[in-house]
Amino acid sequence: MVAAPDRLITLAVVTGAHGITGEVRLKPFTEDAAQFKAYGIFSANGTPLTLKKLRPDPKGWVARFSEITDRNQAEALRGTALTVPRKALPDLPADEYYYIDLIGLPCVDPSGQSIGVSVAVENYGAGDILEIEKADEKRFMVPIAQAVDVHDDHLVIAADFIE
């Protein structure tokens, strides 16, 4: 179970400029700054950005990229997603997965009957939620920890959670 290797994965979003020398504030979608630094080069709407420096900030991280040298350039990046290709993410143990790998997988009930396809993974604070779209295009959500059994090529949804 792996998403397309060239699919872009958003690791952070630029939330604004920091100072006058081109640094940007980031909202990270990963907790590990060391791993974020290891990627080195990110895509910002198709433009490569080379990470020079990263430090913590009360609202996320502050980063400096080689290509961004002043506040105007930094401000222009506000709202820009910083992405890497899926193939750049490290391999995981057999019993772990990235949420991106769940999206697009067929969902079935315990008997193997098709329910729909997974379309999103969300977290509203109480745990991870899988959103499933049925054939009639109606959607419903299930808690991943209690209701989803992950297989390489499909997801089995516990009967009690199927709408």
Curated annotation (Swiss-Prot):
Keyword match Ion transport: no
- What sections of the sequence does the record tag as coiled-coil? none
Task: Give Gene Ontology CC terms.
Answer: cytoplasm; ribosome
Q: Which residues form the PRC barrel domain?
A: 94-162
Question: Record's Gene3D superfamilies?
Answer: PRC-barrel domain (2.30.30.240), RimM (2.40.30.60)
Q: Where in the cell is it found?
A: Cytoplasm
Chief localization class? cytoplasm
One GO BP on record is: ribosomal small subunit biogenesis
Q: Which domain of life does the UniProt lineage start with?
A: Bacteria
Q: Which InterPro entries match?
A: PRC_barrel-like_sf (IPR011033), PRC_RimM (IPR056792), RimM (IPR011961), RimM_N (IPR002676), RimM_N_sf (IPR036976), Transl_B-barrel_sf (IPR009000)
Q: Which UniProt keywords apply?
A: Chaperone, Cytoplasm, Ribosome biogenesis, rRNA processing
The UniProt GO MF terms for this protein read: ribosome binding
Give a short account of what the protein does. Answer: An accessory protein needed during the final step in the assembly of 30S ribosomal subunit, possibly for assembly of the head region. Essential for efficient processing of 16S rRNA. May be needed both before and after RbfA during the maturation of 16S rRNA. It has affinity for free ribosomal 30S subunits but not for 70S ribosomes.
Q: What is known of its domains?
A: The PRC barrel domain binds ribosomal protein uS19.
The similarity annotation says: Belongs to the RimM family.
- State the oligomer form and interacting partners: Binds ribosomal protein uS19.
Name of this protein: Ribosome maturation factor RimM
